[in-house]
C-alpha cells in the first residue's frame, strides 16, 4: 500500500468513514450510539487484533480519528474537515443533513434494505410508495450470479448473517494488505447496504430514497477527499505541481459556512474515449479469427482500464477516482488540472499507440471544470432543464470529447503523410499488414504439417487469447506466469520445435506499454495475481471481473478453443443447419439514462451506483451465464459454454459468436435476465441484432451486418402518439432485417404490460387491442417461422 503516511490515512479513513453503519445494523442495540462511534470501536478492536498491521500506530490513530469525528461540526480543518466535506459532496448536500422528526421516514433496522437504483430511473417525482413496493437487494456478499438480481419488495436476509461473513473475511486482512484489497472488501460486503435510511416524505433528504449503496457512497467520498487533499496546502506539506487550484483550512471553513467558493471550479471531470475499436478488432482473416479475436477485443478493453489507471498514477489519485471504465470509455474525478496537462497526457499516450499501430487506435481525453455546487442535487423543481448536477458535467465532458475527437492527430499531421509501407507482398496472414523491415514475426500453425507467418503484434493477440484461455481454466490471473502457446513458434520450417512461451507481461503489445507507463508494476493500480469469479459466482479477494468465456475442447495433447467450423458443426448436429450466429446487444438510450434518467437527484454516488451495476451485469453476469447455464433443443439440453465464444462484454454492450441455435437461445436468455436485473423498468431496455452466416464468411462483414440489424432495432417504433409525444420504440430483437419488440411481439410478459400501462397514462384503444393480440402470440410459432425463413434465406444466399 506504500509508505504509511497522512495520505494513506486519508484514503483508508475516507473509504471506511461510514463502516459503523454496517456494524450498527448488525448490532443487538443499534440505537445505543451513533454509527461513527460504532465504526470507531470496531476498527480500534480490529487494529489491536492485527487488522492492517503493516500500518504504523500514528496512521492507525489518524484513521480512527477520521471515522470517529467525521460528523463533528466543530472540526472544519485538516483531514477530518476534508473527509467531512467530501461526505457532503458525495451525498449531494451543502450542509449537515437534519430531518424534521414529524416529516421524516426512518426505517427499522431489519427493514433497512437497498432499493435498486433502476427503480428510480426516469420515473419523475419520487414517491413514498416507491420504496414500499420497489424491489430491494438481499443482504448477500457480492457475486456475479444471483445476488445482483432482485424481485422482492421485502428480502428476508438479516444484517447479522452478512456481518458474520464480513468478520470472518477481515481476519485475513493482516500483513501488507493493498488498498485495492481493502476496496474490494468494502465492495463485496457493503454493495447491498443503503448509505442512508431516512428521507423526507415530501421531497428528499440526503439523497432521497435509499438507492445508493454504502460502497458507492464510500468510494466517491474517498475519491472527493483525495482530490481535496491533493489541493490542500499547510505547513510542511509539499504543493502538488499539477493542481491548478489550492485550498487551506480557511478555504475549508468558508465552504462549511457556505460563505463562498461553492461556484469555483476546484475539481475536474476527465473523460477518455478510445477510437478505432471496430476496425482494430475485426479487420482480421476469418481463418485464424478464434485464435486472436478475443486477444484483440480484450486488449482494447484492457487499454481503457490501463490508461485510466495511468492518469490516476500521474495525478497521484487512487482507483476510487475512476468513476467508470468500459466500452472504450473512462471517467475520472480529479482535482482541477490545466487543460495543457490533459493534452500532454493525450499526446504521450497516442505517441506510443501510433508507434505500435499507426492510426488504427487513438485516444481522446478531455476535461471540464467542476464546482462544489455541481455535486449538489437540484432544488429547483420547476426547472425545465433536463440535466442536473453531476450528470450535467458528465454530459458536458462527453460532448467536449466528441468535438475534440474531430481533430485527432492534429499535433503530428506531417508525420501522417510520411511514407510508411514499402509495397511489399510480405504480409501478415491475419491483419494483412506488411512486415517491418527487420521483423521476423512468428509461424502460426494451421495444422500438424503447415504454418504461415504472422507479425509480432498479431502473435501478441494469439498469445493473449491463449493466456486468457488458461486464466479461464485455472480461474486465476497470474501476470508473471508463462504459458506455452500451442499455435506459435519462431521457426516456420520446423513445427515440431517447442512452442513459444509468453506471460501476460511479455507479449509485445503489453511489454511496449509497460516500458513507457509502468502501471502493471505499480501495486497501487494492479496486483500480481487475481482470482476470476468462481463457477458459483463467488468473488474471492483479490478478484478481477474480466469477461472471459471460451468453448474449449480437449484431446490427449492439448486444450484448444473451438473454431467457427467446430461451432457450426455443433449446430448442424442438432438442427441440420451448419451456420454460426453473431449477436450484438446493447442498452438503449444509455446516454440519456446517465444524463437525464436520475433527474435532479443525479449525485456522483448515485451515478457511481448506476454505472457499477450495469458493469456487473455485462462484465460479470453474462460470462457467468455462458459458463454455467444450459439451453434446450428438441427436448435435449446442451451447455452454452460448449457452443459460445464471448468476444466482448462490458460497459453496456456485448458481442457473441457461436453455434447459431445456441446464440438464438442465449439472446433470449440475456434479454430476459436483463429485464429482471433492471426491475422491469420499461425505460431501461436492451436491443439486439443477430445474423446467421457460413463459418467461413468474412468475419468483419458479418459483424457489420449484425451491427446493422442492431441499428434497425434501435430505429424501430411500434407505437407513437404525436399529440402526447409518447411512443414505444427500440427494445427490439432484429433478425433477417425484421425488428420485433421484445415485450409486444416476441413474447407476452404480463408484469411488463402492467408496468408499461402504469407509466403510459391514458393508454389508447389500439394499445389495449395490441395487448390482446400479443397474449395469443406464441414464441414457439415465431421460432418455427424463423427456422423456415432461415432455410429460405440459406437457399437464397447459398453463395455465402
Curated annotation (Swiss-Prot):
GO molecular function, one term: ATP binding
Cofactors required: a divalent metal cation
EC number, as in UniProt: 3.1.-.-, 2.7.7.-
Coiled coil feature spans: none
GO annotation (BP), single: defense response to virus
Domain HD: 1-92
Task performed by this protein: CRISPR (clustered regularly interspaced short palindromic repeat) is an adaptive immune system that provides protection against mobile genetic elements (viruses, transposable elements and conjugative plasmids). CRISPR clusters contain spacers, sequences complementary to antecedent mobile elements, and target invading nucleic acids. CRISPR clusters are transcribed and processed into CRISPR RNA (crRNA). This subunit is a single-strand-specific deoxyribonuclease (ssDNase) which digests both linear and circular ssDNA; it has both exo- and endonuclease activity.
Protein name, as recorded: CRISPR system single-strand-specific deoxyribonuclease Cas10/Csm1 (subtype III-A)
Organism of derivation: Methanocaldococcus jannaschii (strain ATCC 43067 / DSM 2661 / JAL-1 / JCM 10045 / NBRC 100440)
Name of the gene encoding the protein in the UniProt record: cas10
Amino acid at each position: 500500500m506504500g509508505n504509511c503516511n497522512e495520505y494513506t490515512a486519508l484514503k483508508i479513513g475516507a473509504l471506511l468513514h461510514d463502516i459503523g453503519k454496517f456494524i450498527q445494523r448488525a448490532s443487538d442495540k443499534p440505537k445505543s450510539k451513533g454509527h461513527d462511534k460504532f465504526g470507531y470501536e470496531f476498527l480500534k478492536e480490529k487494529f489491536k487484533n492485527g487488522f492492517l498491521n503493516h500500518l504504523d500506530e500514528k496512521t492507525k490513530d489518524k484513521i480512527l480519528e477520521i471515522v470517529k469525528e467525521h460528523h463533528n461540526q466543530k472540526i472544519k480543518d485538516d483531514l477530518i474537515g476534508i473527509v467531512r466535506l467530501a461526505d457532503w459532496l458525495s451525498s449531494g448536500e451543502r450542509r449537515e443533513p437534519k430531518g424534521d422528526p414529524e416529516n421524516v421516514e426512518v426505517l427499522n433496522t431489519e427493514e433497512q434494505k437497498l432499493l435498486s437504483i433502476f427503480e428510480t430511473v426516469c420515473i419523475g417525482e419520487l414517491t413514498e410508495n416507491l420504496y414500499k413496493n420497489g424491489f430491494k437487494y438481499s443482504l448477500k456478499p457480492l457475486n456475479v450470479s444471483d445476488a445482483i438480481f432482485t424481485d422482492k419488495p421485502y428480502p428476508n436476509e438479516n444484517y447479522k448473517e452478512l456481518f458474520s461473513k464480513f468478520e470472518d473475511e477481515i481476519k485475513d486482512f493482516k500483513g501488507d494488505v493493498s488498498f485495492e484489497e481493502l476496496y474490494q472488501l468494502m465492495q463485496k460486503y457493503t454493495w447491498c447496504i443503503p448509505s442512508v435510511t431516512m428521507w423526507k416524505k415530501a421531497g428528499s433528504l440526503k439523497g432521497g430514497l435509499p438507492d445508493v449503496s454504502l460502497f458507492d457512497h464510500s468510494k466517491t467520498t474517498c475519491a472527493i477527499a483525495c482530490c481535496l487533499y491533493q489541493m490542500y496546502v499547510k505547513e510542511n506539506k509539499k504543493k502538488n505541481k499539477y493542481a491548478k487550484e489550492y485550498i487551506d483550512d480557511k478555504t475549508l471553513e468558508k465552504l462549511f459556512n457556505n460563505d463562498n467558493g461553492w461556484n469555483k471550479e476546484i475539481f475536474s471531470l476527465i473523460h477518455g474515449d478510445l477510437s478505432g475499436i471496430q476496425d482494430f478488432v475485426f479487420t482480421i482473416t476469418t481463418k485464424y479469427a478464434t485464435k486472436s479475436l478475443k486477444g484483440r477485443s480484450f486488449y482494447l478493453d484492457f487499454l481503457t482500464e490501463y490508461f485510466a489507471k495511468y492518469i490516476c498514477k500521474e495525478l497521484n489519485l487512487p482507483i476510487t477516482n475512476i468513476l467508470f471504465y468500459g466500452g472504450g470509455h473512462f471517467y475520472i474525478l480529479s482535482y482541477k488540472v490545466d487543460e495543457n496537462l490533459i493534452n500532454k497526457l493525450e499526446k504521450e499516450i497516442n505517441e506510443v499507440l501510433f508507434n505500435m499501430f499507426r492510426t488504427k487506435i487513438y485516444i481522446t481525453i478531455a476535461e471540464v471544470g467542476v464546482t462544489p455546487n455541481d455535486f449538489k442535487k437540484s432544488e429547483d423543481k420547476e426547472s425545465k432543464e433536463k440535466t442536473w448536477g453531476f450528470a450535467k458535467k458528465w454530459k458536458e465532458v462527453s460532448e467536449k470529447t466528441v468535438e475534440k475527437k474531430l481533430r485527432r492527430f492534429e499535433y503530428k499531421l506531417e508525420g501522417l503523410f510520411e511514407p510508411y509501407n514499402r509495397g511489399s507482398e510480405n504480409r501478415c496472414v491475419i491483419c494483412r499488414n506488411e512486415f517491418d523491415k527487420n521483423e521476423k514475426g512468428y509461424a502460426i500453425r494451421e495444422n500438424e504439417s503447415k504454418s504461415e507467418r504472422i507479425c509480432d503484434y498479431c502473435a501478441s493477440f494469439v498469445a493473449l487469447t491463449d493466456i486468457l484461455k488458461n486464466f479461464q481454466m485455472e480461474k486465476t490471473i497470474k501476470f508473471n506466469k508463462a504459458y506455452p502457446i500451442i499455435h506459435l513458434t519462431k521457426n516456420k520450417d520446423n513445427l515440431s520445435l517447442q512452442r513459444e512461451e509468453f506471460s501476460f507481461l511479455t507479449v509485445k503489445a503489453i511489454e511496449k506499454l509497460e516500458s513507457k507507463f509502468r502501471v502493471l508494476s505499480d501495486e497501487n493500480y494492479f496486483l500480481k495475481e487475481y482470482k476470476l469469479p468462481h463457477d458459483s459466482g463467488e468473488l474471492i479477494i483479490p478478484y478481477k471481473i474480466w469477461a472471459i468465456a471460451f468453448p474449449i475442447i480437449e484431446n490427449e495433447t492439448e486444450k484448444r478453443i473451438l473454431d467457427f467450423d467446430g461451432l457450426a458443426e455443433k449446430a448442424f448436429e442438432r438442427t441440420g443447419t451448419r451456420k454460426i450466429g453473431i449477436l450484438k446487444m446493447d442498452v438503449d438510450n444509455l446516454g440519456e439514462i446517465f444524463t437525464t434518467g436520475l433527474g435532479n437527484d443525479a449525485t456522483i454516488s448515485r451515478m457511481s451506483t448506476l454505472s457499477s451495476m450495469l458493469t456487473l451485469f455485462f462484465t460479470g453476469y453474462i460470462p457467468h451465464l455462458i459458463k454455467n447455464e444450459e439451453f434446450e433443443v428438441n427436448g435435449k439440453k446442451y451447455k452454452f459454454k460448449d457452443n459460445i465464444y464471448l468476444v466482448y462484454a462490458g460497459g453496456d454492450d456485448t458481442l457473441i459468436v457461436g453455434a447459431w441455435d445456441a446464440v438464438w437461445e442465449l439472446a433470449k436468455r440475456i434479454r430476459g435476465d436483463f429485464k429482471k436485473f433492471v426491475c422491469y423498468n420499461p425505460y431501461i431496455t436492451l436491443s439486439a441484432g443477430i445474423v446467421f452466416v457460413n463459418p467461413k464468411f468474412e468475419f468483419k462483414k458479418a459483424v457489420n451486418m449484425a451491427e446493422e440489424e442492431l441499428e434497425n432495432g434501435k430505429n424501430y417504433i411500434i407505437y407513437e402518439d404525436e399529440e402526447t409525444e409518447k411512443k414505444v420504440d427500440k427494445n427490439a430483437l432484429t433478425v433477417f432485417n425484421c425488428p420485433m419488440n421484445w415485450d409486444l411481439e416476441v413474447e407476452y410478459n404480463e408484469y411488463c404490460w402492467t408496468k408499461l400501462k402504469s407509466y403510459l397514462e391514458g393508454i389508447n384503444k389500439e394499445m389495449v387491442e395490441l395487448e390482446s393480440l400479443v397474449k395469443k402470440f406464441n414464441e414457439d410459432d415465431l421460432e418455427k417461422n424463423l427456422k423456415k425463413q432461415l432455410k429460405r434465406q440459406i437457399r437464397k444466399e447459398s453463395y455465402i
